[in-house]
């Protein structure tokens, strides 16, 4: 979900001035943090608008991509529980995503070929056709987003973002009961 961000981010000098009043304010860390949030928000907005133009959400697109990956791996069944784990969402959330995709004709639930007590989720021909039509444009748009970065800069960015992500595991967030709880190490995108 997009964040509410300032149109113009504060200049470094303003952050430096703020650190005089708030000694825990690290101006360079705050500057990087704000730029990271702003960039992520804008990339999410652009991607979300493109998906919405094709009547699909981030969450449903994620499920379709996980099932497409399944198709390239061979006859491994994907249960709703496996999909939930892979997407980093709850089973209840995954059930809702699958229900919508099934209603739209993109997936179907079938008895698992290895364990008849379980159900597996599979792409339908309509789901495969949607991805075949949608993905080339999606990948072109992704390339356009990253076109301003050289190959070396892209590798550096991936390495730096991985380091930032590692740092999130040690930062507590406030739980609804007021206590600290760990920040999830995997971002979750849902409808």
Name each model-derived stretch.
Residues 27, 37, 45-89, 172-178:
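N-terminal helix-turn-helix DNA-binding core of bacterial DNA-binding proteins
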Residues 1-24, 152-191:
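C-terminal regulatory/oligomerization modules of transcriptional regulators
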Residues 99-159:
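Charged, amphipathic alpha-helical coiled-coil/dimerization segments
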Residues 80, 98-99:
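Short, hydrophobic-biased segments on the C-terminal half of alpha helices
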């Amino acid at each position: 979900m997009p964040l509410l961000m300032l149109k113009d981010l504060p200049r470094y000098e303003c952050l430096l001035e703020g650190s005089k009043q708030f000694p825990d304010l690290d101006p360079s860390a705050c500057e990087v943090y704000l730029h990271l949030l702003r960039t992520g928000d804008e990339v999410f907005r652009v991607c979300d608008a493109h998906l919405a133009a094709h009547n699909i959400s981030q969450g449903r697109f994620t499920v379709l991509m996980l099932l497409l990956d399944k198709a390239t791996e061979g006859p491994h069944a994907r249960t709703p529980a496996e999909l939930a784990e892979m997407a980093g969402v709850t089973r209840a959330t995954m059930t809702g995503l699958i229900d919508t995709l099934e209603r739209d004709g993109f997936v179907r639930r079938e008895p698992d070929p290895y364990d008849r007590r379980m159900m597996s989720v599979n792409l339908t021909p309509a789901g495969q056709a949607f991805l075949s039509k949608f993905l080339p444009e999606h990948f072109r748009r992704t390339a356009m987003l990253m076109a301003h970065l050289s190959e070396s800069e892209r590798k550096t960015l991936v390495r730096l973002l991985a380091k930032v992500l590692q740092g999130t595991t040690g930062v507590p967030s406030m739980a609804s009961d007021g206590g600290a709880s760990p920040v999830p190490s995997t971002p979750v995108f849902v409808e």
